Amino acid sequence: MRSFFAASLVLLISSAFMIAQESSKPSGEEGHLRALESAWNHAEQSKDAAALNQLLADSFVYVDYDGTLMNKKQFLASTINGEVQNEQINNEGMTVQVYGDAAVVNGAYRDKGLEKGKPFSRHGRFTDTWIFRNGTWQCVASQSTLIRQ
């Protein structure tokens, strides 16, 4: 009887260890959302309006680092209009939390380029809220905040 309990205890502990290892691995959705964040950076850098249009929901709301509030149409226009030429946009330290058909992505970013002909280099944090509907993930809200240098 004692050996049965010992074997059961070993099995229980090893099962708990395996479950803990599995939960620390990113899910398929987490990896997909990280890829979408990278695709967003690439689309913004290359001023790809079609790609951005697919990534952003029609109800998209953006709060820029300076407090500017934009809807999807305004965000696309500001990204495509040419005032900002992003040479580089990189995300760092992203965390992804999936809640069924919704997800929140937090992280830091670094971007540099030209704005109205003047060089800039920014480091900030962002929060993006994504929803899954009609078979695809789309961002419904994004907010960025500059990190003081």
Spans of features found by a protein language model:
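A beta-strand edge to alpha-helix "cap/lid" segment located at domain peripheries
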Residues: F4-F5, I19-Q149
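Bacterial N-terminal signal peptides
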Residues: A6-A16
